[in-house]
Amino acid sequence: GNTYRDGFKQVDIRPHIMGLFIWTGFDYRGEPTPFEWPSIGTQFGIMDTCGFKKDAFYLNKAFFTDEPMIHILPHWNFAYGEEVHVMTHTNCSEAELFLNGKSLGKKNIDKYDMADWFVPFEKGTLKMVGYIDGKEVCSDEVSTANSAKKIVITPQNEFVYDSCDDAVIFNISVIDENGVSVPTADNLIKFTADGGEIIGVGNGNPNSHEADKAEERHLFNGLCQVIVRQSDGAENVTVTATSDELESATATVKSVANENKKIFITFSNKHFLCR
């Protein structure tokens, strides 16, 4: 069958077609086609079941946004000398790849196929620079990570509403001693919550059979997630994440008044009124 790039091109070159429907925005449980057990969910979403962005997210962004952008993939943690297929998702007219400050060449960008390189792995930083009309307009980079040393918690919400069963999403990652995210980490992360109840955990792994209602989760691609529902009367919701041989982390989200006593659901830094 056609690739997504082919499909987008066939729509884009036909001005009488008003748009297209992307299936799917998110991965979901079931329908692991064409994969079989142990897969228990789809793998063709542009975001996984936790809402973590896949590389396909940036391909879509390159197709649909006018703002200059460039995304480099994959990560930069491989065996020394291994040939790595380096690709870019960009809406720029040219892209230049650098390894540890040395240019590996500038390429013209085809709108649909974009550009790629084959690079022998060498520890350090891989940087991609995007150009439009010969001017640098954006860049992206990935660096080699050492062993994970510290947990990082990033609340997806700035606040939580009191007295309305509001919930907070906490995203978990790990970094090395230099502060570089470790994309290959799969540590088991354990959670405790103060001022709320843990109602779900996840990591976006379509092959994971771990319980979603639990107080721990392995990292997948260096990430996992915990969702906490605020307890009645709690002033804050605090989550602590721990793991063997890693420095623990704690994050707190403050409660704000919900004067109308409405019920909200929370998604991606937004609070949507339910009733």
Language-model segments: which ranges?
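Extended substrate-binding grooves/exosites of carbohydrate-active enzymes
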Residues: 1-109, 114-136
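Short, solvent-exposed loop/linker segments at the N-terminal edge
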Residues: 77-82, 160-168
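Beta-strand-rich structural segments
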Residues: 86-90, 129, 154, 165-183, ...
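Short flexible loop/turn segments that cap and initiate beta-strands
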Residues: 91-93, 98-104, 140-141, 167, ...
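Short, hydrophobic beta-strand segments
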Residues: 116-121, 212-232
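Extracellular Ig-like/FN3 beta-sandwich strand-entry sites
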Residues: 121-125, 167, 234-236
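Edge beta-strands of extracellular beta-sandwich domains
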Residues: 135-146, 247-256
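N-terminal amphipathic/hydrophobic targeting modules at extreme N-termini
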Residues: 263-264, 270-274
